[in-house]
Amino acid sequence: MKIWEDEKQVYIRAAMERNMPEQNAALKERLERIDWSILEHIQRKETVNERGVFAPLEAVEVPEIEARRDEFKAAGQDAIRAGKVGAVLLAGGQGTRLGLDRPKGTLNIGVNRELYLFEQLFRNLMDVTDEAGAYVPMYIMTSNINHKDTVAFFEEHHYFGYPKDYVKFFIQEMVPACDHEGRVYMESDTEVAMSPNGNGGWFGSMVSAGLLDDIHARGLEWINVFAVDNCLQRIADPLFIGATIVSGCESGAKVVRKAAPDEKVGVLCTEDGKPSIAEYYEMTQEMATARKENGDLLYGFGVILNYLFSEKKLEQIADARMPIHVVEKKIPHIDLEGNMVKPEQPNGYKFETLVLDMVHMMDDCIPYE
């Protein structure tokens, strides 16, 4: 049965009743390209949150990093110089919470002069590439909302001095949004209400955009993925890359030491023997406050969404179905009469995959302080 034939889908059917035949023909084509099996996750949304047995995971801490600095740095720089390292910047969001009706990365964070978030991130990257004497390919994930503005911003600022050939943009894949009964919302009479598929969808979106050929052509073996929010982070950090390579692990996560047991940050640990991230609200009081013999927290390192993944492993898990997180959100839509509704309270579900679930699909992961 086609989605528009389902009597339950009242928003789609109401829009079609208002449309002209040619509008419905185009709408049906779009509807047929959407994977509607995602709606099934509403019925089993609680199962995603069922967790296994957590156990602590030893981190590579600052004293060890300092003691092995030359070893880690050499291994990381060798990988960069050999063209084995790429980076992915997750930048699909708008700066709405920052009072900005533009891509978040275009925020001016300068004090005495203009300095944009995107600019600072590329400066951080160029600190690494200048020292290594080799460029790192940068793939920037945008969204339908901000893609054109993001590309135009980079063009306007001449890619902040970074070679244009080493920068590629791709759009994050979108999934439909629905009400609490699974009835798909419409954004307009001819467009389904769609939302980004979560930060765990970045590699799948790269594949869909045809960038796997570029990755193979460049010979990339490691991908450093990170979020746009943190202007201080070191990108393609040779010490981090080197520590991961030397450890023999197929992934690594940059972590920061928790300031307090109840700090609201997810911690890197193991779950049923595999690397995983326990969110702060999933941790029992006993877990949160447990300490080692030296007094340090047993679960003491929080993740900051800066990961290094083996490209080979990413391809191996690309076809695996990642857990779908059903998230209650406020979803603007048109009602059954075609009037725009902007809810003040959550009125339905969006469907997201999370990068933390990619970590759990790895065989091992090194926490790097």
Write out the residue ranges for each language-model feature.
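N-terminal ligand-binding/catalytic initiation module
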Residues: 2-3, 229
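N-terminal glycine-rich phosphate-binding loop and ensuing alpha1 helix
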Residues: 3-168, 176, 185-204, 212, ...
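Short secondary-structure boundary micro-motifs
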Residues: 71-73, 80, 91-93, 207-208, ...
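Hydrophobic/aromatic beta-strand patches that form the interior of the parallel beta-sheet core
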Residues: 88, 107, 139, 168-170, ...
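Active-site-adjacent bridging/hinge elements
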Residues: 88-100, 179, 284-285, 326-333
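Fold-independent oxyanion-binding glycine-rich loops
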Residues: 92, 143-144, 172-173, 208-209, ...
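Conserved beta-loop-beta/alpha segment of the NTase-like Rossmann-fold superfamily
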Residues: 159-160, 164-263
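Catalytic core of tubulin tyrosine ligase-like
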Residues: 215, 219-224, 232-236, 241-369
